[in-house]
Amino acid sequence: LGAFTFTSCDDFLDMQPTNSGNAEGAVGTVADAQVVINGVMSAMTSSSYYGRNLFMYGDAKGGDLTIFAAGRGLDAFYTFNHTSNSNTYSGFWSRGYYCILQVNTLLSNIEKLEESGSMEDFSEAKGQALTLRALFYFDLVRLYGLPYNYNKTSYGVPNVTEPLTVNAQPTRATVEENYRQILQDLSDGAALLAKKKTKQSGYADYYTNIALQARVKLYMEDYDGALNAAREIIESGVYKLYEPADWTASWSKQFGSESIFELGITTEESDLGTSSLGFYLMRYGQLKNAMGWYLASDYFLNRLGEDETDVRWGIMDNDEYWVDNEIERKGACYKYMGSTTLAGDGKATNTAVNIKIIRLSEIYLIAAEAALHSTKQEAGADAAAGYLNEIRRRSPGLAPATAATITDDMILDERSKELFGEGQRFFDMMRMGRTIEFNDDFQDIPVSHRGKTIDRTFEKIVLPISQDEINANPALENQQNPGY
């Protein structure tokens, strides 16, 4: 396949650094360091992180998904039925910090090797590790902290950059301090990475780092910085947008021309099977044990339906409502089954579909939004429309954006259409201060833990720290998020 194979989580725990004292000598060479990084990336494919829940969380809470019936599983994302003792989804916290602490131990071990006179060049390994740590902190602060541009002095998550001792009890940093650490890691990481696309697909390389910088700076409303980073990737020519006619088929391919950072899923190790993202988004009952627990909301379908010739209909198909009512409703998403015919992406099982974390399409959309607000000479509404129209070509029935017509809402709508199922919508709506409306009336499902609409003043837009985590680290007891 031209890509590395992730080691399993079990193997990783058996042979790689942990936070116990006996991990000190586990890394001696660059090859050892790369095996550790492989293990960290394998851990990312867990159902509690990128393997499923993070993407489900972003779209369910953002109003682009709805549910057909209550009580099937993961519907607490949609209903906001979270407390510190139930439906905490603490796997986000534990998996995120597991990955962070493995990276910290790796960086500490490398530092000791370098200080002892090792002649190995660990630059790439350190650059990858720092880039990944920045991603992990970015995810955690979005889940547990308020938007940067809303209240950056509120609690974020603990900034831990060294291996922890047994008795350590780190406290929460502010959102601003988290973002400062994220930017520092990205800056330090970029300086260590070769300015090229990695030969082995799937690793966090230089362009992964720059893409993350673009995403993070957009969240911070550093529009000049976001535009600089996005333009560097676009103008490098390393990646190429799919032609509209090729967009649907791209989901049945691995490491395509748009893929900047993509997690490889293997049939032997990280295939979640009936617990996979694909099974949760496809039509209920289409295959044995197919979940179909989430469907596209009417609001998303109306948005995509602005152009019935939009190529992105190609990964949508009839959902459970169609089964029950014989009325066409293309609310089932097949991005993570490869195609509506369940083609997969070239592996032995059709649920072992790679997770595309950052695509070039997103970078164009970042460039459009940043250019619309940037003060840079090469920015402005004309430039913003140009970037947006490269993605809007996938909706041939819609008029191109112009300097006179382009708005934040137009870009936000395009982000919804393009990034559906990729976990971005909720965070976009929160950072932009928008009101989210939920499609509760679709099946008249009663929801008591939120209203039909929410905005970022609603306390439960952030998750609780689970009581188990507080019991393990009493220093967090007085730092619980409001409302829990």
Stretches with model-predicted labels:
Residues 24, 51-68, 145-153, 157, ...:
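Short, surface-exposed recognition loops and adjoining beta-strand edges that mediate ligand/DNA contacts
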Residues 73-144, 173, 191-196, 348-355, ...:
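Conserved, well-structured interaction surfaces
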Residues 31, 220-221, 227-348, 353, ...:
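Extended ligand-binding clefts on enzyme/binding-domain cores
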Residues 179, 223, 377-381:
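TPR-repeat structural position
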